[in-house]
A protein has these predicted regions:
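Generic beta-strand/beta-sheet core signal
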Residues: 10, 41, 53, 61, ...
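Amphipathic alpha-helical segments at domain termini/boundaries
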Residues: 33-138, 156-157, 161-170
Length: 192
């Protein structure tokens, strides 16, 4: 990664859990407690924290595209040692699991996906194929939840508010104005 890199699994904010092995690889690389923190909160960690935790292998300075190409060349030439995350065992961290189940019960009692995130991370104590199947089943449950649809709608609505399509439009000159009604509001508008 680059120094400005931020690593995260923010899917919980959309009412789902990370897919494609995110809930299985994060605990294998960074430990169960960090995975629970990141996955249940959607928190992104800075590059140095990700490196210290083992989520990434190194931090390189430079242009991201050039860094990626150089890393790909080094991997093809066998100069980078790859980690097979599926072969890394995860010890069950019962205190962390209990803490996060309790935390989700207090902070997210009415939300569906944070609880499923804890269940999915717990599945990382199984062999990778079983953990991935468990993740997939939990992902499907979240996908079918009406909360997911609402959170996705809210996500896009928040972004749409920041867009002003008429931002560069030139205002037209007002030449005439008419006020209908002579009550309190109408007379107030007319005098303004």
């Amino acid at each position: 990664g680059t120094p400005g890199l931020r690593v995260g699994l923010p899917e919980v904010n959309l009412g789902i859990i990370p897919g494609a092995g995110g809930t299985q690889r994060a605990p294998r690389l960074g430990g169960m407690r960090l995975a629970l923190d990141m996955i249940t909160s959607g928190r992104h960690v800075p590059a140095q924290e990700a490196l210290d935790a083992g989520l990434i292998d190194e931090i390189r300075e430079g242009e991201p595209r050039e860094i990626a190409l150089a890393a790909a060349r080094e991997a093809l030439e066998g100069r980078i040692e790859t980690r097979r995350t599926g072969e890394i065992a995860v010890e069950r961290d019962e205190p962390a699991l209990s803490e996060y189940r309790e935390k989700m019960a207090k902070q997210a009692s009415l939300l569906f996906s944070p609880h499923k995130c804890v269940d999915a991370v717990e599945g990382a104590t199984k062999p990778i194929a079983e953990g991935m199947a468990h993740e997939r089943a939990l992902y499907r449950e979240c996908q079918e939840s009406p909360q997911r649809a609402g959170l996705v709608h809210a996500f896009f609505a928040e972004r749409a508010v920041a867009k002003f399509p008429e931002q560069d439009a030139e205002p037209r000159e007002i030449k005439k104005i008419g006020v209908i009604g002579g009550g309190t509001m109408g007379s107030g508008i007319a005098t303004a």
